[in-house]
């Protein structure tokens, strides 16, 4: 970002949020490539020729000439002016990456200043950015709550909604018009945002730009909760949390009155939704709103969200996107876990003089279980097993060295163990480890044209050590396996505060 700052200071127009001139600067696209912001995207090409910065420079020059740009966008059946029809999508991707870099520039000073301010107040604030920090929050709060709203955030059916979100921050109309033109003329724009299981799925080739726009779309509606709940400490959104400061937001409060058609008194709206025990958590396209209140209050929140999305964002959301559930009777499907609050009975015997009686004390406990079926489906998609969970050999890795094969399988196994270490029941996790271990053994046996039994007999314990996590190795050296303390540590949940994101298992190669 320092290199961007040095070049941008040459042009004072950006200080007034005029980013339009930067679109025609070729060094922006060079940075997007050289700094590895999305190298896999820029190098992804169906043809034999690799990425060419010269072709991008020619494309930028053509953008000055509107007639040539329109011809290039509209005449998809003819040869483009590069003479490489099959590479058109590649250079649309490059322009998309350049746009992503440019639209992020006006927000970088705000983001940096906000993070610097937070570091002065909160020590080790990086732990709060871990997605695993959500589950200790659940353990601490959910035991005292009653109801939960499971919300699937509606995706924008029109890209214009995403562009309009930027207009409050970027005052340069020219850059927004060009961004809008680029989105509309993109040949495969219908595949950029696809409804799939009621969540926004972004194309991998254009993930940076459209994920940026979508996060702003979500962040804008989340800022309403900051005002309504008046408890910003409970709002632990893991994405763009530093951008929740909205100077322009208070000028739009009058629009909230229109959300509720049955009243014109804004104070009445706040009173209807006031809840001192309201907690909100979001990860990607799913959010959870938990409360200690009554079912009537949860229905009010549900009604508010439906009307707010429709009136303020022009988004229609079907009723099935929000579910009201009781925590004591329902499990939350969130971030790969089934989370629930269950009651454990603790029986205490009490004796008074000659009479004795038993006291049954119910104790609430937060329970997390691994969703084994989707996880096995991911392993099957990555060709580690079949759809029934039977391990198979990874044939595409048979050309690698034995050490590389074992390292890849071991890394995937350790990463899964690392992420799902917070599970209350380890049986499902042991099954996943078994699938990966046997798949690795079959891959090595296939490479050496041997049997799995003979291969395991030759390697012995050295093969199994590749699949141990660092924590398991340390515990095995300190404590014996048959001790009660060791068994408690192995079975107990662990939550790690260094997990920032989740990668696709099929692409972990």
UniProtKB/Swiss-Prot annotation:
The UniProt record lists the keyword Disulfide bond: no
Keywords for the protein's UniProt record, in alphabetical order: Chloroplast, mRNA processing, Plastid, RNA-binding, tRNA processing
InterPro entries in the record: Domain_X (IPR024937), Maturase_MatK (IPR002866), Maturase_MatK_N (IPR024942)
Organism: Schlumbergera truncata (Thanksgiving cactus)
Protein name, per record: Maturase K
GO cellular component: chloroplast
Keyword tRNA processing annotated: yes
Function: Usually encoded in the trnK tRNA gene intron. Probably assists in splicing its own and other chloroplast group II introns.
Top-level lineage group: Eukaryota
Biological process (GO), any one: mRNA processing
Compartments reported by the entry: Plastid, Chloroplast
UniProt-recorded Gene Ontology molecular function terms: RNA binding
Similarity field: Belongs to the intron maturase 2 family. MatK subfamily.
């Amino acid at each position: 970002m320092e290199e961007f700052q040095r070049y941008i200071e040459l042009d004072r127009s950006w200080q007034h949020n005029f980013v339009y001139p930067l679109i025609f600067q070729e060094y922006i696209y060079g940075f997007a490539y050289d700094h590895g912001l999305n190298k896999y995207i820029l190098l992804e090409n169906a043809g034999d020729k690799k990425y060419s910065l010269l072709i991008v420079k020619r494309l930028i020059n053509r953008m000055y000439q509107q007639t040539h740009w329109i011809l290039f966008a509209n005449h998809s059946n003819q040869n483009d002016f590069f003479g490489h029809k099959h590479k058109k999508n590649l250079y649309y991707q490059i322009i998309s990456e350049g746009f992503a870099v440019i639209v992020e520039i006006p927000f970088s000073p705000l983001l940096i200043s906000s993070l610097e301010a937070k570091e002065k107040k909160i020590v080790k604030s990086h732990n709060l950015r871990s997605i695993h920090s959500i589950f200790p929050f659940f353990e601490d709060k959910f035991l005292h709550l009653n109801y939960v709203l499971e919300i699937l955030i509606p995706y924008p059916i029109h890209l214009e909604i995403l562009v309009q979100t930027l207009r409050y921050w970027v005052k340069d109309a020219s850059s927004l018009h060009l961004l809008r033109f680029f989105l509309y003329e993109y040949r495969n724009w219908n595949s950029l945002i696809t409804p799939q299981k009621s969540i926004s799925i972004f194309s991998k080739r254009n993930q940076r730009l459209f994920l940026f726009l979508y996060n702003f779309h979500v962040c804008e509606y989340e800022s309403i909760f900051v005002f309504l709940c008046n408890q910003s400490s409970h709002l632990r959104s893991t994405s763009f949390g530093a951008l929740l400061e909205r100077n322009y937001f208070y000028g739009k409060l009058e629009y909230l009155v229109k959300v509720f058609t049955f009243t014109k008194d804004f104070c009445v709206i706040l009173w209807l939704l006031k809840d001192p025990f309201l907690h909100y958590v979001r990860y990607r396209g799913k959010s959870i709103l938990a409360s200690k209140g009554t079912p009537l209050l949860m229905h009010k929140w549900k009604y508010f969200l439906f009307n707010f999305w429709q009136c303020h964002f022009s988004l229609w959301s079907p009723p099935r996107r929000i579910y009201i559930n009781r925590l004591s009777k329902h499990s939350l499907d969130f971030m790969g876990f089934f989370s629930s609050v269950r009651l454990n009975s603790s029986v205490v015997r009490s004796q008074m003089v000659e009479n004795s009686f038993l006291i049954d004390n119910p104790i609430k406990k937060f329970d997390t279980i691994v969703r084994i079926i989707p996880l096995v489906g991911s392993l099957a998609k990555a060709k580690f097993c079949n759809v029934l969970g039977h391990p198979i050999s990874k044939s595409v890795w048979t050309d690698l060295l034995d050490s590389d094969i074992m390292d890849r399988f071991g890394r995937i196994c350790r990463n899964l163990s690392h992420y799902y270490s917070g599970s209350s029941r380890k049986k499902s996790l042991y099954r996943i480890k078994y699938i990966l271990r046997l798949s690795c053994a079959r891959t090595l046996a296939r490479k050496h044209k041997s049997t799995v039994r003979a291969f395991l007999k030759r390697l012995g314990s050295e093969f199994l050590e590749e699949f141990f996590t660092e924590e398991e190795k340390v515990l095995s050296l300190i404590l014996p396996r048959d001790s009660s303390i060791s068994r408690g540590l192995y079975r107990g949940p662990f939550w790690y505060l260094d997990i920032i994101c989740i990668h696709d298992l099929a692409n972990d190669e």
